[in-house]
Swiss-Prot record:
<comment type="similarity">
    <text>Belongs to the conotoxin T superfamily.</text>
</comment>
<dbReference type="Pfam" id="PF16981">
    <property type="entry name" value="Chi-conotoxin"/>
</dbReference>
<keyword id="KW-0964">Secreted</keyword>
<protein>
    <recommendedName>
        <fullName>Conotoxin Lt5.10</fullName>
    </recommendedName>
</protein>
<dbReference type="GO" id="GO:0005576">
    <property type="term" value="C:extracellular region"/>
</dbReference>
<dbReference type="InterPro" id="IPR031565">
    <property type="entry name" value="T-conotoxin"/>
</dbReference>
<keyword id="KW-1015">Disulfide bond</keyword>
<dbReference type="GO" id="GO:0090729">
    <property type="term" value="F:toxin activity"/>
</dbReference>
<keyword id="KW-0732">Signal</keyword>
<keyword id="KW-0528">Neurotoxin</keyword>
<feature type="signal peptide">
    <location>
        <begin position="1"/>
        <end position="19"/>
    </location>
</feature>
<feature type="propeptide">
    <location>
        <begin position="20"/>
        <end position="54"/>
    </location>
</feature>
<keyword id="KW-0800">Toxin</keyword>
Length: 69
């Protein structure tokens, strides 16, 4: 009868320390990969927008840089 409370306490202590399941780790990896992809797309869009602004400023100042347009 004394073993039952000790067993229950040990179960409660051991359950939070259980390793994550494979499914949870895969979900975390997919979420992290999605965020990384979103950051790359945002950065690429930001850089292309910055280049467009620089190109338009260059065309206003000197027409030789926008001969391709």
């Amino acid at each position: 009868m004394l073993c039952l409370p000790v067993f229950i306490i040990l179960l409660l202590l051991a359950s939070p320390a259980a390793p994550k399941s494979l499914e949870t780790r895969i979900q975390n990896d997919l979420i992290r990969a999605g965020l990384t992809d979103a950051d790359l797309k945002t950065e690429k869009g930001f850089l292309s927008g910055l280049l467009n602004v620089a190109g338009s400023v260059c065309c206003k100042v000197d027409t030789s840089c926008c001969s391709s347009q």
